[in-house]
Amino acid sequence: MLYSCASIGRPDGGPIDETPPRFIGSNPAAGALNNKRTKVSLVFDEFIKLEKATEKVVVSPPQIQQPEIKASGKRIQVNLLDSLKPNTTYTIDFSDAIVDNNEGNPLGNFAFTFSTGTEIDTMEVAGTLLDASNLEPIKGMLVGLHSNLNDSAFNKLPFERVARTDSRGRFSIRGVAPGKYRIYGLMDADQNFTFNQKSEMIAFHDSLIIPRMEERTRMDTLSLIHISEP
């Protein structure tokens, strides 16, 4: 008679889930026009959570009152406490803060956009922010745009559009309208989107930023076949 002792442990659970959450719907709808709602509900295909939301999630135009952002089950609720500006594109950039509840797979570069007017501004200003002294990337720095081209705007007015640099110093300011801008970097200690403390680290670019749409034509490859007549 043969016998063996049973091993105590968890049953095999199959392969590890490496699929990030998938966005499946929202209220208001993504890309909604003439939106007046300050509360946004986002729905995903699985249970999710937010990681370091206060560091990673950026609302543009910037909000003086910190938005309320909560994850529950398969939903994320965003409550914008500032009044909405008319005829303005709003972008809630989550970066990689949204992850699935079990394995922590991130939904990378996810952003939600709506407009309080009749159109969505779709241009982006992207780049990399480096420390001038050693050319190392700067993480977590606010990068913002001013359409007011006076130098005094930087320390008198809040940014109009913003983004935050990642661990490689990269940033992408979304929802930018056509026009001319000055761009600045700011380690915003008091979170008022304005340079008003001498201790705050700053960065700037000498040239104006003029985003524009470019038409690109893609040429497909054609194969030329020679057919001989009989």
Regions found by a protein language model. Give the residues of each.
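Acidic carboxylate motifs that coordinate Ca2+ or other divalent cations, activating on Asp/Glu
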Residues: 192
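Residue-level detector of conserved catalytic or cofactor/ligand-binding positions
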Residues: 222-230
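Short, composition-biased linear "edge" segments at structural boundaries
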Residues: 205-214
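Acidic, low-complexity Ser/Thr/Gly/Pro-rich repeat segments typical of extracellular/periplasmic
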Residues: 5-168, 172-175, 180-186, 198-204
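Intrinsic N-terminal pre-sequences and regulatory tails
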Residues: 6, 216-223
